């Protein structure tokens, strides 16, 4: 996916519905010496919500990996930290936008405090590949069908 195919900050902040959502605490092991979330932990949070989306779409992610059928490695990621998250904060992690191409998917993510403050926004791009050859393969039909018609989804 080319850079211009990613999502604008305004689009991420203004998204009205979540494609996947997960509530969780910021745990002690998630913060750094400054007492705020350690920067790579947000990617773990994004990944967990993304996995929830794939499972909701009916994809057998563990089985597909075990059978070496397909995988969707991350090829791009970015995050903007807008407000601090600290140990003990309760947050909601959302996948709010998606763009589905022939062999790739892009997602926009948000992490919000329970008071509605958006603390982190980010984007990830995944390319679907054969787990055996690592050559690109089409985005699974089940995922494309699940996302079709949802608010915030662009099917290319």
Predicted segments, located by residue:
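Terminal targeting signals and extreme-terminal segments of soluble enzymes
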Residues: 1-92, 98-156
